[in-house]
Regions:
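Extracytoplasmic c-type cytochrome modules immediately beyond a signal peptide or single-pass transmembrane anchor
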Residues: 168
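Major-groove recognition helix of helix-turn-helix-like DNA-binding domains
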Residues: 99-118
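Single, function-defining residue in the core of a domain
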Residues: 1-89, 113-116, 123-131, 142-146, ...
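Noncatalytic carbohydrate-binding groove/subsite architecture in carbohydrate-active enzymes
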Residues: 139
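Extended, structured, electrostatic nucleic-acid-contact surfaces
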Residues: 91-99
Length: 475
């Protein structure tokens, strides 16, 4: 297909169908010259297994589900992001391998994308992240435990009636002048950066907040995991819901924490008793009484520097009461929450998911999960490169890895199988070379230096602005 992924016909990727047990497995596949990293990690066999698991039936045609998924991945990874570019990649791949060339018309490809199940794409994305998490070195984890960062953001999409109905624009915008807006909450691995789950809702309304979306992802977490979050998630009810699942939380304490008192003072953090707050609206009396009347937590003071380089202190609370983990470790762990912000930037800016292209909610969901699948696949390649060079995956630049893969992929595909090993070694070395620095307490002003070019803003819908009697306003 496109130069980003393929090196030969699909039969080449028929493997035993076992899940990737370790990074050594991926490295061994590279050594056998079986092709590019993505095709080795996401094999045709594994895609077909997920399709069968979801009862997806299909015919053998040019745009089969496997071909369509790879084309969709190629599309979200390219700078162009257009369907025409994806179809051109498919045509180039077929021509290079002696197959009949299909029509350049994008209709068949778009129809094939619409036939894909969102559940298939989400399963592939989460499965890739989970396989990577289980394969990572123990030293990459925090005290041997898996840590996940939860955070929220928003994405916009084309202004169509279907999108507006499910994800309406903010009410302050006039009809025809705004764009549908959705809120997303993601669960990211601190060790690998992979995205393990995502929940989406309209930007405003009941049950659309980040805390409500986070509750949908509880089942993704396992007993013994640790969640790192900002002050929004310093919530009595969320803390208890996680505690019941044997999941610890580390969060910044809210400025006005009602109902808590210090019961024990220590250099490693104060032990506080948090009294159950008043019943929230929307919670029944029976549900409210199911929560305990108090919780015991640990509060740690963290030193940080503000934008003026002055030391300021803030409080971090956690359910980790084990004294063998000192307060400094808790504070250092919370400061790494910033890496989740950088991951979201990588997904939205580097992979261009901040403004989606699809015109219906169903296709928007598929586009989002395909972005996350591509993101997790690239994170897996980064983990292999990091393991080869004895560094942590978090030290590898995501954008540098994406640039290296884009540069090397066409050369690896064009090379003979016996000549691919040196190219793959060079790819992994190049990915590991581009690293990010250790930047604790990093602070950047949310402002731009370069001024955008002046352009008048639409004050009425475009189809009205284009009418003859309105043209004089724009020229």
């Amino acid at each position: 297909m496109g130069p980003v992924f393929y090196s030969g016909g699909w039969n080449r990727w028929q493997l035993e169908g076992d899940s990737m047990a370790s990074l050594d497995t991926v490295r061994a596949r590279f050594a056998r010259n079986e092709g590019l990293p993505f095709a080795d990690i996401l094999t045709e066999a594994s895609i077909r297994d997920v399709l069968n698991e979801h009862g997806f039936t299909y015919r053998d045609r040019v745009f089969s589900p496997v071909t369509t998924i790879w084309g969709f991945l190629s599309q979200v990874l390219s700078e162009d992001h257009s369907c025409r570019d994806a179809v051109s990649r498919i045509i180039a791949h077929r021509a290079a391998n002696g197959h009949a060339v299909c029509s350049p018309n994008t209709a068949s490809y778009c129809n094939a994308r619409s036939r894909l199940l969102t559940s298939v794409l989400s399963t592939l994305a989460t499965q890739t992240a989970e396989e990577l998490q289980t394969s990572v070195d123990r030293q990459w984890k925090w005290n041997g435990r898996s840590v996940f960062i939860v955070d929220g953001s928003s994405v916009s999409m084309p202004d169509t009636p279907e999108n507006q109905q499910m994800y309406p624009q903010v009410p302050q915008q006039a009809t025809g002048l705004g764009f549908p807006l959705a809120r997303i909450t993601v669960l990211l691995s601190l060790a690998t950066g992979a995205c393990h789950d995502l929940a989406i809702a309209s930007y405003q309304g009941k049950g659309t907040g980040e805390k409500s979306l986070f509750r949908r992802m509880y089942d993704t977490l396992k007993s013994g995991d640790v969640v790192v979050a900002d002050a929004l998630f310093d919530d009595y009810f969320i803390v208890w819901e996680l505690y019941k699942r044997n999941i610890d939380i580390v969060a910044r304490a809210q400025y006005e924490r009602v109902g808590s008192r210090i019961s024990e003072t220590s250099s490693e953090g104060d032990i506080i008793v948090w009294q159950r707050p008043n019943k929230p609206r929307g919670m029944t009396g029976a549900q409210y009484r199911s929560y305990p009347k108090s919780l015991v937590m640990r509060q740690v003071t963290v030193d940080a520097r503000d934008k003026n380089n002055r030391v300021q202190q803030f409080k971090v609370v956690t359910t980790i009461l084990n004294v063998s983990i000192d307060g400094t470790q808790i504070g250092d762990l919370f400061e790494r929450r910033w890496e989740g912000e950088v991951d979201i930037r990588s997904i939205k800016s580097t992979m261009q998911m901040d403004i989606l292209r699809c015109k219906t909610p169903d296709m928007v969901h598929k586009e989002i999960w395909t972005h996350l699948l591509a993101y997790n696949l690239l994170r897996t390649v980064m983990a292999v490169a990091a393991d080869e060079n004895d560094i942590e995956p978090r030290k590898v630049s995501f954008k540098g890895a994406k640039q290296a893969l884009t540069a090397f992929a066409p050369k690896i595909e064009a090379a003979q199988p016996e000549n691919r090993a040196p190219l793959i070694d060079a790819l992994l070395t190049t990915i590991a070379y581009h690293r990010v620095g250790n930047r604790p307490g990093r602070w950047e002003p949310r402002a731009r230096k370069r001024r955008p070019k002046h352009a008048a803003r639409l004050t009425q819908p475009r189809h009205i602005s284009k009418l003859p009697h309105n043209r004089s306003k724009w020229f």
